[in-house]
UniProtKB/Swiss-Prot annotation:
The gene is fusA. GTP binds at residues 17-24, 81-85, 135-138. Belongs to the TRAFAC class translation factor GTPase superfamily. Classic translation factor GTPase family. EF-G/EF-2 subfamily. Its main location: cytoplasm. It comes from the Bacteria. Catalyzes the GTP-dependent ribosomal translocation step during translation elongation. During this step, the ribosome changes from the pre-translocational (PRE) to the post-translocational (POST) state as the newly formed A-site-bound peptidyl-tRNA and P-site-bound deacylated tRNA move to the P and E sites, respectively. Catalyzes the coordinated movement of the two tRNA molecules, the mRNA and conformational changes in the ribosome. It comes from Natranaerobius thermophilus (strain ATCC BAA-1301 / DSM 18059 / JW/NM-WN-LF). This is Elongation factor G. Keywords: Cytoplasm, Elongation factor, GTP-binding, Nucleotide-binding, Protein biosynthesis.
Length: 691
């Protein structure tokens, strides 16, 4: 089977936005116009094609990024729908890693919301070229120009409008196309009947001003166009498009479009822009990786986007499917792969057989015998592969850069209701943590309870909900708990000596360590400075293990210790009695003893909280934030409301949604995401230590 679409005619794009900016509706319309869906699904009816989990249809939000494929203008477009809720940043991070380009969807009224900022900066980190689509031009308070200003101020995105709206709110009738210098007026609500006309008189001046700005930006990427522009010569639409494409691919500018997906206005032009400005796999630099066993070498191995290169792909999502079992979504970066062949997972060091390959369309699927470079598909039969791992050809192994996932900040205890549920719960939680790296589970040694950890209350609610619906596990859920940690503030030296000698084989381990604090978020470092073999090499990993085990229970209140550097600099051993376990215990003793002397403190997660409230409730809401140990960073006006930016400890944020609702009579909204860990005040540390 040969390729259906050349690589240049492939687009791998994501649609990213704030919750409620209309992202799923926009995706729906794209699928409708590209002929994949014959009836439109509305998110607020709970009938949308992309939202195929029960929880999504009920809550009207998108949780798992479904990958879908469609075609437009002889080009294959693979779309990954990403969630806009802060608790699911991992899904966004995951999809950005495998995309080549993205559409940022903004609400014409809300503009650049806090979550859009987070996602935008995630995309900056991966150098993903973007176009922006200002949606909901038909709603009350829609303001295209305000959103463009916000993109400038908050995202430093260098927005370049290539369209302007004609009218707004109920009067939104059409779109000015600045590139062709014409206007499109829509005749009906299905968006299928429209006509191209001259730009309305009352808009000509504005259109000219914005067209000039656009040409000025485009001219920076094409010298010929620059000359024509300066000399006032005619410039063709194609020349403008190619120059803007150049700037967009370099992520130096963002073409801005507008429309109303719900009213079917502007979607086809958005599709054209995807093909005109966003990159094909051939436009992005070759993917880099390291050859297993040669990790220390400076030189990276490169794989060019071509079917003739050795096969390499990244598994970016694992889903448990009720019909086929474990589905592993992957993006092919080079080469091709046939169903039934073997791939190598260099991270696990295992060969696996790809049973079947499926191409997904939200929740309907097609079998593929072979997938090529640039394709996004799902494999059945990969039992050992986890999110973020590489798949490659066994003959030419490579490890592609993996993804970074944030640590979970909130935990709840969960208990099965019956004995039968107990067994099912363990396997179900295992499956869920395979799907989602920010969800972790462990058993509390003291209480024997199962503890689940995640990124926020909504995240854990969805998990518990899925246990019940998908896996039929009934469970009682405890109160959410904060993931406190401990660290040290002062450097110190410490000694650990473990000696048992009473007839027969004894035990002997003796270590001297230096402990010093690291900056927040640095984790743990272990340096071996042993010289002259005072501790034999084979025992050093045991010391490291002993210390890491001791770090699981801090000295103040038993929370995990973080951000510590350990240097092992001296010690001694006994020819006969020394062994690994003795050195492990000695390491652990040295760490516990040192921690007490190194000014230990308790840390708590601090959340970045942004609250939007009507002006009259501002005083009450700010008072409430202060009473929660919050620190207000700043305020700004936001179309009739006020936006309050603050940092509040997670411990004080439980149940905040209900409190805000009652304070503002349901008119306030807030978003919250993890920011950093900080020291707990003494009074609270005392409470935590007394528990």
């Amino acid at each position: 089977m040969t390729r259906k679409f050349p690589l240049e005619q492939t687009r791998n794009i994501g649609i990213m936005a704030h919750i409620d900016a209309g992202k799923t509706t926009t995706t729906e319309r794209i699928l409708f116009y590209t002929g994949r869906v014959h009836k439109l699904g509305e998110t607020h009816d709970g009938a949308s094609t992309m939202d195929f989990m029960d929880q999504e249809q009920e809550r009207g939000i998108t949780i798992t990024s479904a990958a879908t494929t469609c075609q437009w203008r002889d080009t294959r477009v693979n779309i990954i729908d990403t969630p806009g809720h802060v608790d699911f940043t991992v899904e966004v991070e995951r999809s950005l890693r495998v995309l080549d380009g993205a559409i940022g969807v903004f609400c014409a009224k809300g503009g650049v919301e806090p979550q859009s900022e987070t996602v935008w900066h995630q995309a900056d980190r991966y150098h993903v070229p973007r176009i922006a689509y200002i949606n909901k031009m038909d709603i009350m308070g829609a303001d295209f120009y305000n959103v463009v200003d916000m993109m400038n101020e908050r995202l430093q995105a260098n927005p370049v409008p290539i369209q302007l709206p004609i009218g707004k709110e109920d009067d939104f009738q059409g779109i000015v196309d600045l590139i062709k210098n014409t206007a499109v007026i829509y005749k009906d609500d299905l968006g299928t009947e429209w006509e191209e006309v001259e730009i309305p008189e009352d808009m000509q001046e504005l259109a000219e001003e914005y067209r000039d700005k656009m040409l000025e930006m485009a001219a920076e990427y094409d010298e010929e166009l620059m000359m024509k522009y300066l000399e006032g010569e005619e410039i063709t639409s194609e020349e403008i498009r190619l120059a803007l494409r150049e700037g967009c691919l370099k992520t130096e500018l963002t073409p801005v479009l507008c429309g109303s997906s719900y009213k079917n206005k502007g979607v086809q032009m958005l599709l054209n822009a995807v093909i005109d400005y966003l990159p094909a796999p051939t436009d992005v630099p070759p993917i880099e990786g390291v050859v297993p066993g040669k990790e220390d070498e400076e030189e990276k191995e490169q794989r060019v986007s071509s079917d003739d290169e050795p096969f390499s792909a990244l598994a970016f999502k694992i889903v448990t499917d009720p019909y086929v079992g474990k589905l592993c979504f992957f993006r092919v970066y080079s080469g091709k792969i046939e169903a039934g062949s073997y791939v190598y997972n260099p991270v696990k060091g295992k060969k696996e057989r790809v049973g079947r390959i499926l191409q997904m369309h939200a929740n309907h699927r097609e079998e593929r015998n072979v997938v090529y470079t640039g394709d996004i598909a799902a494999a059945v039969g990969l039992k050992n592969t986890s999110t973020g791992e590489t798949l490659c050809s066994p003959e030419k192994p490579i490890v592609l850069e993996s993804m970074q996932f944030p640590e979970p900040v909130i935990s709840v205890a969960i208990e099965p209701k019956t004995r039968a549920d107990q067994e099912k719960m363990a396997t179900s939680l295992q499956k869920l943590s395979e799907e989602d790296p920010t969800f972790q589970t462990h058993t509390d040694d003291e209480t024997g309870q199962t503890i689940i950890k995640g990124m926020g209350e909504l995240h854990l609610e969805v998990i518990v909900d899925r246990l019940l619906r998908e896996f039929k596990v009934e469970a009682n859920v405890g109160k959410p708990q904060v993931a406190y940690k401990e660290t040290i503030k002062a450097p110190t030296k410490s000694e650990g000596k473990f000696i048992r000698q009473s007839g027969g084989r004894g035990q002997y381990g003796h270590v001297l360590i230096e402990m010093e604090p690291l900056e927040r978020g640095a984790g743990y470092e272990f340096e071996d400075k042993i010289v002259g073999g005072v501790i034999p090499k084979e025992y050093i990993p045991a010391v490291d293990n002993g210390i890491q085990e001791a770090m699981q229970n801090g000295v103040l209140a038993g929370y995990p210790m973080v951000d510590v550097k350990i240097t092992l600099y001296d010690g001694s051993y006994h020819e006969v009695d020394s062994n690994e376990s003795a050195f492990k215990i000695a390491g652990s003793m040295a760490f516990k003893d040192g921690s007490k002397k190194a000014s230990p403190v308790i840390l708590e997660p601090i959340m970045k909280v942004e609250i939007v409230v009507p002006e009259e409730y501002m005083g009450d809401v700010m008072g409430d934030v202060n009473s929660r140990r919050g620190r207000i960073e700043g305020m700004e006006e936001r179309s009739g409301s006020r936006l309050i930016r603050s940092y509040v400890p997670l411990a004080e944020m439980f149940g905040y949604a209900t409190q805000l609702r009652s304070t503002t009579q349901g008119r306030g909204t807030y978003t919250m995401e993890f920011s950093h860990y900080d020291e707990v005040p003494d009074s609270i540390a005392k409470e935590l230590m007394d528990v």
